[in-house]
Every structure is written in structure tokens, then in C-alpha cells.
Amino acid sequence: MTSKANDHPAWAAPYLAKLGFDDPESLGAPSLDTLRRLHRAHVELIAFENFDIQLGRPQGIDPAESIARILAGRGGYCFNLNNAFGELLTVLGYDVTVHRGQVNGSVATAKATADEYTTHMALTVVIDGERWSVDVGLANSHHEPIPLREGVHIQGPFRFELRPLPEIGPDAWRFFTDPAQTTFHSMDFTLAPATWEDFRSSHTELSTSPQSPFVRWFELFRRDAGCAEFVLDDEFTRDEGAGRRTTRILESAQELFKVATDVFHLDLSAIDDADRAALWDRIQRAGAEWRAKHESAEN
């Protein structure tokens, strides 16, 4: 659907409003400065979250549904967030490409070929002849776009790194998250173009398989200039880098949903009391099992 006021889709203005911007016409021509502002706003205001997967009713990942989620005050995981943001940037005139990526828990779990990259939808944007890594769906990583150049990239208190992977292919790269972070190790991606449809089967597996981390554990993330905030099961962490990290255990469903609303800017009014209680029971048990496992390993 296209707005009568201009040639932008009708969803573009309310999407931008969610990010704190006026209508598309007010942004002017695509620029690196505007891209940075849009990216920062997205990771600050639109959370990475898996509430629906945890409730056993995963949503689709097509662009229209992903955008509708954001307009309804929700977030999603990479397939939702990067799919929606890529669509927004495209209608705003940016040169956007979708790529296949793979999140690694460690180097040992990295795939041997780019054909095996299926678990992450990565984006790049070319501006003024330079390609940038754009990612609003990689948990507690990018706060703003990162130039696709080999080396270390500092964003606020966090240190990221990009390296080419010639052993995989001429278009393969590895993004390393901050060494002090524990949520994931790295993300490999290939610059070969992809489409959102390439991730359908991976989404089905990641959103329904009992072995999927998104089915096993509750996850909630946001970034801003000075910190990363996240909830893993019932533990709420604020990480300000350089060892400045505080974690507390949430005590109730009410506290979880208050944090999700007040800190992560989510509208969860569609989740009723029964589902909230069932979800909290699941999250609390998973958190207790995780702590018991790690306490046992340390003894």
C-alpha cells in the first residue's frame, strides 16, 4: 500500500515515528549521517526479543509481517528486525543487500563453507562507494553501521573486529563481538546476495526445534551508546564494557514484563495473564537450571 502523500508505502511514516523521526520526506536524500541515526534509534528502541517463540506460537518473517510487528510495538529476532529495517532503508532510497550469515558460539562451531550460513540474516548498505555492515538484529552488537574494513572498530565501550575469511571465499567475512561479551563469539557472513525467502527453513527450525537456543532460552536485548542491556531467562544484565557489568535475578512475571516495557520499550498488552504466568514459570526454571549447571561445573 502506498501513501497518497508521496510514493512511500503507508507503513513508512509510522515506522519512522517508532524511531522518533518525522515522515520520510523530512529525511532528505540517503546519507551516512541519516543511516547512522536510523540505526542507533532502531537498536535503542526496537528490541531483539523471542516472546512469541517462547510461548510456542512463532510468527512469520516476511517483510510485511515483520514491519507489522514493529508498528504494533513489538520486536523480534534477526529475521524480523533486519528484514523490516532493510525494507525501510530500501524505500528510503538506500542501496541495501541481504546476505546469509552464521552466528558462532565459538570458533570451533564455525561452518566450513558459506553454503552452510543459515542462522543469521545480515545486511550491508553501500554509501558513497563504501560498503557498511548494518545489523539491528545481532543481539548486543552494532550500535551503528560499521565500515566493511578489516580491523578493530570501537563503538562506545565495546571493541568489535572484522576480518576477511579467504579460506571460505573472497566474499566471506567474520564479525567478532567484544571479547568481554559472553552471548556469542562471532558472526560469519558472505557478501553474495540473498533474499528473505532463503531463511524460511532456518526460521522454522530456529523457532520450533527443541534444540534451538531461541526455544530453549528467553532472550531480550537492546543497545545504546554507553551500554548493552539484556535479559537471558530470568537474569537482567546491564553491561557498560571494561568489566562494568551488573546482573540481577528477576523475581516475578510482573517484574519481567515491567522491565520489558520500561527498559526495552515493548508493548506486550496482547499477552494475557495466563500466558505471562506460564512463560514466567518456564523462564524461571530455565534460569535455575542454567545456574545449577554452571555452579556444578565450577566446583
Regions found by a protein language model. Name each.
Residues N6-G73:
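Secondary-structure boundary elements
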Residues Q54-M121:
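Active-site neighborhood of thiol-dependent amide/isopeptide-bond enzymes
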Residues K18, V91, D262-V263:
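Residues at alpha-helix termini
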Residues D234-N299:
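Extended, charged low-complexity segments
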Residues T2-L19, E44-A47, Q102-Q254:
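His-Asp-centered catalytic microenvironments across diverse enzyme cores
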Residues A13, R36, R40, N80-V91, ...:
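A broad, structural surface signal
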